[in-house]
Regions:
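Bacterial signal peptide processing site
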Residues: 22-25
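N-proximal, solvent-exposed amphipathic alpha-helical segments enriched in charged/polar residues
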Residues: 32-180, 198, 202-204, 232-303
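Extended, H/D-rich, highly charged conserved domains that either
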Residues: 211-222, 235-237
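C-terminal motif of bacterial Sec signal peptides marking the signal peptidase cleavage site
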Residues: 17-20
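Bacterial N-terminal signal peptides that target proteins for export
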Residues: 1-9
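Short, non-transmembrane amphipathic alpha-helical segments
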Residues: 191-217, 323-345
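A solvent-exposed, charged loop/short amphipathic helix patch at secondary-structure junctions
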Residues: 179-196
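Hydrophilic extracytoplasmic domains
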Residues: 271-375
Length: 375
């Protein structure tokens, strides 16, 4: 079932306009002009909610509205960073915008053109750039690096008597730990310390906040900021959020809080064993003994405040015959039930060169794993 409401385009346009930036203002004018052709948009919300961890989504005119800067946000250096960047911002947002009170909408305020200008270097041609101007130095320690990698917007809507309206915004700021560049045709890189990254991120967040608040419709809208530290290209764990803050009004953020997150890749290398790593090592050993031709068995464990919040196990196999996949999935299920943590959500993904072959999910209420084999 879906709830169906009608939302005036002019009202929506006033909400999503961004007078602080000429490009967004122009986009808003185009949206207003298009309302002459149609007086209303049909906005629907899904009534089914998979769990309290998920937001119900809004659908406009029967279609899911993608993020206005979607093309720009796909440019982080690894898929692991991109995944953590997007899902981590939702995790931060839940504490400010409860899932039982707010609906999720992909960002509709900051468009791709504006994002591209903001994440570029500041210059005479691009005064809105949030990265420092090129100082002409090409040495790793002397050049002005690209600090800001990406900006992600998520909108959180509330339901009123007759429609939906903007209830809050979350802005993710992805910052580089390593800036990759080319010098005389050769690959080079500049490492960025955590201290410098945080200093730059706070300044960038305040600038973005000021630009958003210049729009009357956004002066009193709560805006959550999350600072994400993007890891290097060879890190398969991916980055994490390191800072968060919420601005209720005004143009300065003064209430930054540290976010204690980390991603640990298993098996560990030269590190002290943990409860999760020991359980995984027992699981890995037994699975590989049963199927010695596996290409690899690894895991990623996400921690929040030093507590394991999720484990994702990846098993790569060289074979993909149906009988072999079934046998492997059955054995992995048995071993997972025997060794893997019972108090932490765990997923097991079995893949081959053709893609995912089987998927195991732990039923937390029963403490057992179930599996699905893909055709």
């Amino acid at each position: 079932m879906r709830k169906t409401l009608r939302l005036g385009l002019l009202g929506l346009a006033s909400v999503i306009s961004l007078a602080a930036c000429a490009d967004v203002t122009r986009a808003n004018q185009q949206s207003t002009n298009s309302s002459k052709d149609s007086n209303t948009k049909v906005v629907q919300s899904t009534t089914n909610q998979l769990s309290n961890n998920f937001y119900r989504a809004l659908v406009t005119n029967g279609k899911y509205e993608v993020n206005q800067n979607r093309g720009a946000t796909l440019s982080l250096n690894t898929g692991f960073n991109l995944k953590n960047f997007e899902t981590g911002l939702i995790d931060l947002s839940r504490s400010v915008f409860p899932t039982n009170q707010y609906f999720f909408r992909e960002g509709q305020i900051i468009d791709a053109e504006t994002t591209a200008k903001w994440i570029a270097r500041k210059s005479d041609k691009n005064p809105d750039g949030l990265n420092p101007a090129d100082n002409g130095d090409t040495s790793p320690t002397g050049r002005a690096p690209i600090y800001l990698a990406q900006i992600l917007e998520q909108d959180y809507m509330i339901q009123t008597e007759n429609n939906f309206e903007l209830g809050g915004i979350s802005i993710g700021i992805a910052m580089n730990s390593v800036d990759y560049y080319t010098n005389d045709g050769k690959d080079a890189e500049t490492e960025i310390s955590n201290e410098v990254m945080i200093e730059q991120a706070k300044a960038i967040a305040n600038t973005i906040l000021t630009r958003l608040r210049q729009n009357d419709a956004l002066k009193a809208v709560p805006i959550v900021f999350g600072v994400f530290r993007q890891t290097s290209k060879d890190d398969i764990g991916g980055g994490v959020y390191v800072l968060e803050a919420t601005s209720v009004e005004g143009t300065e953020i003064t209430n930054w809080s540290n976010v204690n997150q980390k991603v640990v890749v298993l098996p560990l290398v030269n590190e002290s064993a943990t409860e999760e790593s020991t359980a995984f090592e027992n699981f890995r050993t037994e699975v590989q003994n049963f199927f010695p031709n596996l290409s690899g068995v690894t895991a990623r464990v996400m921690y929040q405040d030093n507590v394991a919040k999720k484990m994702v196990v990846n098993i790569m196999t060289q074979f993909y015959g149906e009988s072999e996949i079934i046998a492997l999935a059955q054995h992995v299920t048995d071993v997972a039930n025997k060794y893997l943590p019972k108090t932490t959500p765990v997923e097991v993904r079995i893949s081959s060169i053709n893609g995912m072959e089987a998927f195991l999910l732990q039923d937390m209420s029963q403490g057992v794993f179930t599996y699905h084999i893909f055709d």
